[in-house]
């Protein structure tokens, strides 16, 4: 009886380990034109999220949620959090998120709200 219980526990532990190992890790890359891949020949292949996905391989699913000219600042001229891509990134329910926002926040019309940057980032 003792051997059966130990065997069952061992089987459960191995099953959990194997199941955990098969889980694909989802990565959402959010950001501005740099994330989107502006300036590359083929953003679907050459943007940093695409290259990251190629480098990480099969155990990872990397999606690009970049939108050109977007800001972190909610009072900025094009706030990322008001975009459909932001809602899609949330719905994706990623395990890891990379954020590349801030470049467009330094434009004069946006930087006047710099005191809100930390609050908007939270």
Predicted regions and their residues:
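Bacterial Sec-dependent N-terminal signal peptides
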Residues: 1-22
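Alpha-helical cap/lid subdomain in secreted, periplasmic
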Residues: 2, 21-22, 54, 77-122
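A generic signature of intrinsically disordered, low-complexity regions enriched in glycine/proline
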Residues: 7, 36, 50, 108-109
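Residues that line or immediately flank small-molecule/substrate-binding pockets and catalytic motifs
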Residues: 8, 31, 101
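Amphipathic, positively biased hydrophobic alpha-helical segments used for protein targeting
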Residues: 9-11, 18, 42-44, 48-50, ...
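Serine-esterase "nucleophile elbow" of acetyl-processing enzymes
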Residues: 19-67, 86-91
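Acidic/histidine-rich helix-loop elements
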Residues: 37-44, 64-81, 107, 111-115
């Amino acid at each position: 009886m003792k051997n059966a219980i130990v065997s069952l526990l061992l089987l459960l532990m191995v099953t959990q380990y194997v199941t955990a190992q098969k889980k694909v890790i989802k990565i959402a890359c959010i950001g501005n034109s740099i994330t989107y891949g502006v300036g590359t020949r083929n953003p679907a292949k050459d943007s940093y999220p695409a290259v990251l996905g190629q480098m990480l391989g099969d155990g990872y699913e990397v999606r690009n949620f970049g939108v050109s000219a977007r800001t972190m600042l909610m009072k900025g001229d094009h706030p990322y959090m008001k975009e459909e891509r932001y809602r899609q990134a949330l719905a994706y329910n990623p395990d890891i998120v990379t954020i590349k926002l801030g470049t467009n926040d330094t434009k004069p019309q946006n930087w006047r709200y710099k005191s809100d940057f930390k609050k908007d980032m939270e």
